[in-house]
């Protein structure tokens, strides 16, 4: 037995070394043009210079990093297998044995509430946190369509754009306020969700993804070319900002203002903090709404449809209504986020709603874990903060961003907090008992 264990460990170590060597070779080939060779200006002429020590350090770091990563992954897999063999608990006991998720959620909420107070003098931090919350809200909206209903949507940014332009037009053309336009914009985007969902009822997988991708591009092209309505490529400017119960965030004047009403000295940070708490309120309401929907029959129908559509139809579930409701609710939540985006920016254009935005939102849902609310929050933090932290490394910013995404998918293939647990393991455990 000892000889067998020793041989297994030797094979595992050899496999790890081979894998790390492969990564080092790939890093060497990619690093020669990116790191090993560079151009320097010498007397007005460009000359090729070499940086072999930096390249060697990069290759060594990749080799050691991959070796360490494989070791950690193997240890985690071994520990998981040991735990599964020793686990005799029922599914309900396993679910209740994760109280740290609840503590993590409450901790994140407390941190979000106190963040503007802790960074009241740092507008950049509050602005970045506001951007994170926008993507959290978008991720929760797309999570209804992709994570719960299992419908791959590559054009989700279209609903984001419809909500933003609806508020922009209602506020600039008709003088509507933020809270007046918010439910109307949600209804408009929900109707667009039904409009998209109706012709795609019989489509699945890749075909559905292609249709939704085309829908997103159609919306963007319409916004670019319909200049009378959308302003074309120039967009819509002078969009009113939301106020605090009618009190604008302006310097004191003849009209009552927020600072004057509360006896404060005027500061531009007041509006930034107010917008942060506003999107935090919208995000919390979105979370409560989606969590409640998941407990209702419609939410259970979404998840059942995701697992096996044919079985759902055999049980009498109306697949058409289930799909349309997922598209409509997901679109409505994206429209709410679009309304806030337009109100925050004061200016929107079609360039704000490209396919890249859809890809980022989908990546947030996938990396966070399909169907996981808290996972969407963590993935939004990673995907929004990484590019911000990499601004000082402009040359390697996207390289670091892509490497982080790859590492997350290697470490957690089901997402940071995978919601879908394999049921067969519990069934086999019950059968064994």
Which stretches of residues belong to each language-model region?
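Membrane-water interface segments at transmembrane-helix boundaries in multipass membrane proteins
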Residues: 2-134, 164-187, 217-305, 313-329, ...
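Short loop segments and helix-boundary regions at transmembrane helix junctions
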Residues: 10-15, 145-152, 190-229, 369
């Amino acid at each position: 037995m000892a000889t067998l264990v020793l041989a297994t460990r030797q094979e595992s170590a050899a496999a790890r070394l081979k894998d790390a060597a492969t990564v080092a070779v790939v890093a060497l080939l990619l690093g020669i043009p990116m790191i090993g060779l560079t151009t320097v200006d010498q007397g007005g002429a460009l000359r090729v210079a070499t940086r072999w020590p930096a390249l060697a350090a990069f290759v060594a770091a990749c080799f050691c990093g991959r070796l360490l990563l494989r070791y950690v992954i193997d240890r985690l897999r071994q520990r998981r297998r040991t735990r599964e063999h020793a686990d005799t608990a029922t599914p309900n006991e396993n679910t209740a044995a994760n109280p740290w998720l609840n503590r993590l959620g409450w901790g994140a909420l407390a941190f979000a509430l106190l963040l503007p107070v802790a960074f009241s003098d740092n507008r950049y931090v509050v602005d970045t946190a506001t951007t994170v919350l926008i993507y959290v809200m978008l991720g929760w909206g797309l999570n209804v369509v992709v994570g719960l209903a299992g419908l791959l949507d590559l054009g989700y940014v279209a609903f984001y754009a419809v909500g933003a332009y609806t508020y922009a037009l209602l506020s600039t053309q008709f003088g509507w306020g933020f809270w007046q336009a918010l439910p109307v914009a949600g209804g408009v985007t929900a109707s667009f969700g039904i409009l998209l969902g109706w012709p795609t009822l019989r489509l699945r997988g890749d075909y559905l993804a292609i249709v939704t991708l085309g829908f997103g591009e159609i919306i963007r092209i319409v916004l670019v070319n319909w200049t009378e309505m959308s302003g074309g490529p120039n967009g819509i400017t002078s969009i009113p900002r939301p106020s605090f119960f009618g009190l604008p965030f302006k310097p004191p004047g003849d009209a009552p203002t927020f600072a004057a009403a509360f006896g404060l000295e005027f500061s531009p940070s007041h509006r930034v903090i107010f917008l942060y708490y506003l999107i935090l309120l919208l995000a919390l309401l979105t979370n409560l709404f989606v969590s409640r929907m998941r407990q209702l029959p419609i939410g259970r129908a979404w998840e059942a449809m995701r697992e096996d559509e044919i079985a759902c139809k055999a049980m009498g579930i109306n697949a058409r209504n289930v799909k349309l409701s997922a598209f409509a609710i997901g679109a409505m939540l994206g429209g709410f986020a679009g309304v806030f985006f337009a109100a925050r920016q004061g200016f929107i254009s079609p360039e704000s709603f490209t396919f890249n935005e859809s890809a980022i939102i989908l990546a947030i849902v996938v990396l966070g874990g399909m169907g996981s609310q808290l996972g969407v929050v963590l993935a939004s933090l990673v995907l929004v903060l990484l590019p911000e932290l990499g601004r000082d490394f402009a040359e390697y910013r996207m390289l670091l961003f892509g490497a982080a995404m790859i590492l997350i998918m290697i470490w957690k293939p089901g997402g940071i907090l995978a919601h879908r647990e394999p049921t067969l393991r519990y069934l086999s455990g019950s059968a064994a008992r």
